[in-house]
Amino acid sequence: VVSDASRWNEKYAAASLASALRVEPLLESHQRDIDGLLAPRTALDIAAGTCHAAVYLAKRGLHATALDCSAVGLGLGEQLAKREGVAIKTTTKDLTVTKLPGGPWSVICCFRYLDRNLFPQMAAGLAPGGLLFYRTFNVHHLKKATAFNPEYVLQPGELNREFSTLEILSLSDGDDPEENTSWIAARRPA
């Protein structure tokens, strides 16, 4: 059995540095909320891959930490950060067996990765007034990607239930059968 880290390292070893910073639309649409954050102005990018979200948040003035199982992907992220003129911290972690680093975090984000065991840690790791940004595939993705593992898709209403202690800023929770991702932007009450 090939480990997740080996599989992702192999994938990223065949990749080259992205020609441009790819900004997650959920972050971009909440840029004003991000820019208005108070201290500690720290960000945690979970399952960061090549760190585009961490680099974007660093460019917005946050101290960004990127976590991923792939040292190769994080290495590409460090190159991206350098090219974009910012510094990020990268940490190689197997997220399936590791607890998230303690906060408090001003921003926690995670895109295209699902480990439901992390949801309580994500909510608890936010600083008062901190922001959560999360997007991944939902059950409607299985119509197009029939080989995709159904354990790794969100069910309708799941994000609203899992993050009920947070104030929802925007939410698409699997109700639209034409939308194959679900997302949430939420704030921890101050």
Regions found by a protein language model. Give the residues of each.
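Glycine-rich SAM-binding Motif I of class I
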Residues: 51
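Conserved class I S-adenosyl-L-methionine
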Residues: 40-47
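Conserved beta-strand signature within the Rossmann-like core of class I S-adenosyl-L-methionine
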Residues: 130-137
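Conserved SAM/SAH-binding beta-strand->alpha-helix loop
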Residues: 70-72
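A short acidic, Gly/Pro-enriched loop at the edge of an enzyme's catalytic core
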Residues: 100-107
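Core SAM-dependent methyltransferase catalytic element
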Residues: 174-190
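Conserved alpha-helix/loop element of class I SAM-dependent methyltransferases that forms part
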Residues: 20-39
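Conserved SAM-binding strand-loop segment of SAM-dependent methyltransferases
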Residues: 84-95
